[in-house]
Curated annotation (Swiss-Prot):
Membrane topology term: Single-pass membrane protein
Protein family membership: Belongs to the cytochrome P450 family.
UniProt name for this protein: Cytochrome P450 71A2
Phylogenetic classification of the source organism: Eukaryota, Viridiplantae, Streptophyta, Embryophyta, Tracheophyta
Residues holding heme: 448
Gene3D superfamilies, alphabetized: Cytochrome P450
Protein's UniProt keywords contain Oxidoreductase: yes
Localization: Membrane
Amino acid sequence: MDVPCPWYSLLIPLFVFIFLLIHHCFFTTSKKQNMLLLPSPRKLPIIGNLHQLGSLPHRSLHKLSQKYGPVMLLHFGSKPVIVASSVDAARDIMKTHDVVWASRPKSSIVDRLSYGSKDVGFSPFGEYWRRAKSITVLHLLSNTRVQSYRNVRAEETANMIGKIRQGCDSSVINLGEHLCSLTNNIISRVALGRTYDEKESGIEHIIEQFVELLGIFNVGDYIPRLEWVNKFTGLDAKVKKVAKELDMFLEIVIEEHIIRKKKEEYTSTGEAKDFVDVLLEIQNGNETDFPLQRDSLKAILLDSFAAGTDTTFATLDWTMAELLRQPRALKTLQDEVRGLAQGKSEITEDDLKNMQYLRAVIKESLRLHPTQESLLVPRESMEDVNLLGYYHIPARTQAIINAWAIGRDPLSWENPEEYQPERFLNSDADVKGLNFKLLPFGAGRRGCPGSSFAIAVIELALARLVHKFDFALPEGIKPEDLDMTETIGITTRRKLPLLVVATPC
């Protein structure tokens, strides 16, 4: 005999079905919309949060992070951008999920200047980038290769010291000009094989424009409907002109090397092979299984030559400015350098090994002024990812790490606004970003491969400067009155020239 089923028992599977449906809809929707839970300033139609970037974006974003938190969501036009201003968020992006965030967003200006983004710094993640970076790391900027250029660094710093000594007859010198000339000459000899006279080639002006263009915010990349503005403002024409001039210059350099190779006029000076030599050997030989095309060769050269010159100079300029503002730190550095030099007429790179305060000075300058990138070059997620284990971030989202803000975070640094090199004397903080508190060269897969070369130039130049001269500000300028106004491009420079009085020791 069949027992009638109570009517309410029929509701059980209905309730189960409704529960599962609600559970699925709620959690699926929640997962997709979790990014909306990120703190976010109110955005405007079309432009999003672009109006909040200001003339100094690293400072504007730092101010916003103080209100909305160390991880926040902005929109540049319609594109979502995560801004990270904390050690934890930086570590999550550049270490925990480094592979996911290893690509770069497309930039139309960079594309046109670097042969379709065939350089290492801006190339999207993939097999081409792996091969290009491998060439840079193993063949151009290995520790062995960096050491092979020590004679170039020694000769050019000695030349700079001589020129400053000649200029001491006048009461005031422009130290910034000497520092800029130093870095230009060193990197030109290392990358291109010789220095190029500005009147002969105009290369310094071309490179200055190149670096300026790399730092321009191109609204067309974020609001495609406004791409026409670049033609109206003349930006498109300027990019085209600079790209053409750079290409013509690099072609001349490469052809010079090819002709010299045919005549077998190499090594007569005993100098190490320059970057063009190495890249041409790779192109023509079997050192790698990577077919290095002409455009790729030129793009890789641009990375090392153009970007390296500007950032190294800016770091030296900021460091000397900070030391002039802090006479006590300058005196401590001079005492260390002169004491360890032990009466030697010339500082060598071997003498630098025991100069702990020198390294602390450089780290402190890079903490306050991460000239390579106050805002690290944007990364782009290649797939969905959970940020800090909580926020679900969709693929193709950009991430900007505010290295300037992290270097001034009171949770990581005591008295963060004060210049105190002593904080690094017993610290494990490294300029290569291993603990993510100090990020002047980025970190992870997209970290700058030229950090060792840059530090080698900076250390020797600073040591020789404070060994040979006493420095002071011009009469009437107090240390606290030295103008430290910034100007922004792909690097963060001081805006005004560094004028000093140099007295030979």
